[in-house]
UniProtKB/Swiss-Prot annotation:
Keywords: Cytoplasm, Methyltransferase, rRNA processing, S-adenosyl-L-methionine, Transferase. NCBIfam families: PRK00103.2-3. This is Ribosomal RNA large subunit methyltransferase H. It is found in: Cytoplasm. S-adenosyl-L-methionine binds at residues 76, 108, 127-132. Its EC number is 2.1.1.177. It comes from Rhizobium johnstonii (strain DSM 114642 / LMG 32736 / 3841). Its main location: cytoplasm. InterPro entries: Alpha/beta_knot_MTases, RlmH-like, tRNA_m1G_MTases_N.
């Protein structure tokens, strides 16, 4: 199953970008053994519209336009469902085992996500109830993707 990340906003050079890249690289190397492939990390510029609702609508349109037909869409939102790492790995494994070919994980902009995305989403997850900066969210999801691969492959990286 091909997995992509869609993020509103660009990750600037620095330790967050380096760490995210390290985990995406680990995922890209280990994922194919369990049927998961990193296809892309797409960054789009934040909308310059004058109000939040228009910005969210424009950013949602960019995301929806980039989705492949039939792609699973997982939104990251502080109001989403909290999963532990094993449950997240099992969710990815379940989509893979159902024969799903594409999965996109979306990180919204500073204003959040447009309501239309919740209607389209297959799942809405959170990385905890706290609000995280977008730079850290990207790093956290990169690490969790790598951790999911290690869980699915029985690698000892994930210890309970």
């Amino acid at each position: 199953m091909r997995i992509g990340l869609f993020a509103v906003g660009r990750l600037k050079s620095g330790p967050e970008k380096d760490l995210a890249a390290r985990y995406f690289d680990r995922f890209a190397k280990a994922g194919p053994a369990v049927g998961l492939e990193l296809t892309r990390v797409a960054e789009v510029a934040e909308s310059r519209a004058s109000n939040a609702e228009t910005r969210k609508r424009e950013e949602a349109a960019m995301l929806l336009k980039s989705l492949a037909d039939g792609s699973i869409l997982i939104l990251l939102d502080e109001r989403g469902k909290a999963l532990d790492s094993e449950a997240f790995a099992n969710l990815l494994g379940s989509y893979r085992d159902q024969g799903k070919r594409e999965l996109t994980i979306a990180i919204g902009g500073a204003d959040g996500l447009d309501p239309s995305l919740y209607d389209r989403a297959d799942a809405t997850l959170c990385l905890g109830k706290m609000t995280w900066p977008h730079q850290l969210v990207r790093t956290l999801i990169a690490e969790q993707l790598y951790r999911a691969v290690t869980i699915l492959s029985g690698h000892p990286y994930h210890r309970v």
